[in-house]
Regions:
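Primarily a LysM-type cell-wall glycan-binding module
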Residues: 128-159, 167-178
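Secretory-pathway/luminal and periplasmic proteins that interact with or process carbohydrate-rich
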Residues: 118-121, 161-166
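...with weaker cross-activation on analogous glycine-rich loops/strands in unrelated enzymes
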Residues: 63-128, 190, 195-208
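Cysteine-nucleophile protease catalytic domains, especially the papain-like/related folds used
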Residues: 2-84
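Small/polar beta-strand repeat architecture
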Residues: 164-196
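Ubiquitin-like/PB1-type beta-grasp interaction modules and other compact soluble beta-rich domains
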Residues: 14, 25-35, 96-106, 222, ...
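Extracytoplasmic/periplasmic, Sec-exported soluble proteins
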Residues: 28-32, 114, 133, 144-147
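Active-site or metal-binding loop neighborhoods of secreted/extracellular toxin and effector enzymes
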Residues: 187-288
């Protein structure tokens, strides 16, 4: 069954409480302070000093725990935010209103000979903020983001200027995204911001990158379980562990030292640092 907000048969139902995908601030002030766990749960910090690990905020003993298997992860995740995060027995189900869905995977193998493995998180997004590049067309972006052409056409009728150089990225470089082949279509002006509803998943590769809407093959993610999660060189997140529903704007992960993190993440471009206050004001104005 194809979801109304996606042209892909693999799209999963949304609750309506999903965040908008944006590169900022996660790819700027949060790039070296927030990992995949923080990003998926929406717990932004611009000064976190240690890697966030499920259960660590509650001082749960690791007991030689490795992230090559899923053992013990559910207990640790639920302990971090009791009453605000719930394990979903059916990963295909819709999250309840006010909640959004995340998925956890682990890496039994990697290219480094690492014996402890690693975890990785993905989060369902409800809309996208994207900056056009040379060659973009209405039809091409519709295929890339798995939406109807009318959705892109409507967004193209109300484009805006990017607020920062990185505003509108969906990968480290938008030109590296694997784009579906299309015939010549309606050309779009490069360097403009489009905002439109979508049903895709995003993730963040630890402290090494900003948020991504693409998998290891450069393709946008409709269902993380069907995406390429084998990074080379890197970890191979081949084992699906569980899906969770997360109360939006109510959770914290790891050693979150940013007092405004939970509030700010609900409007992702409101960067919570002094030198970005002007950017935040512009974003608020652009949404009116």
């Amino acid at each position: 069954m194809v979801a109304k907000d996606s042209t892909s048969k693999w799209a999963l139902p949304k609750s309506g409480s999903e965040r908008e995908y944006t590169w900022d601030p996660w790819g700027r002030t949060g790039v070296t302070h927030d990992n995949c766990y923080d990003y998926a749960f929406g717990s932004f910090s611009n000064n976190r000093v240690t890697k966030s690990v499920p259960g660590a905020s509650k001082n749960i003993s690791s007991n030689n725990l490795t992230f090559r298997t899923c053992d013990g992860i559910v207990k640790r995740v639920l302990a971090d935010n009791p009453g605000k995060v719930f394990h979903m027995k059916n990963p295909n189900a819709r999250a309840r209103p006010g909640f959004f869905k995340v998925m956890c995977f682990v890496a039994p193998s990697n290219d480094f000979g690492n014996s402890t493995g690693d975890f990785h998180w993905y989060v369902q997004m409800g809309s996208v903020r994207y900056k056009t590049v040379p060659g973009d067309t209405v039809e091409g972006l519709a295929k890339l983001f798995h939406v109807r052409s009318a959705v892109i056409r409507a967004a193209a009728a109300r484009t805006r200027r990017p607020l920062t150089n990185s505003d509108g990225k969906i990968a480290t470089n938008n030109t590296n995204v694997k784009r579906p082949a299309t015939k010549v279509g309606t050309r779009l002006t490069p360097g403009r911001i489009l905002r439109f509803p979508a049903n895709l998943w995003a993730h963040k590769q630890g402290h090494a990158s900003g948020p991504l809407l693409i998998d290891a093959s450069g393709k946008t993610i409709v269902d993380p379980r069907k995406s390429n999660r084998k990074w080379h060189p890197g970890f191979h997140y081949t084992k699906f562990c569980a899906a969770y529903q997360v109360q939006r704007g109510a959770v914290r992960t790891g050693n979150n030292r940013n007092g405004n993190a939970v509030k700010n993440v609900n409007s992702p471009l409101k960067v919570s640092v002094r030198n970005a206050q002007n950017v935040a004001r512009q974003v608020n104005n652009s949404k009116r």
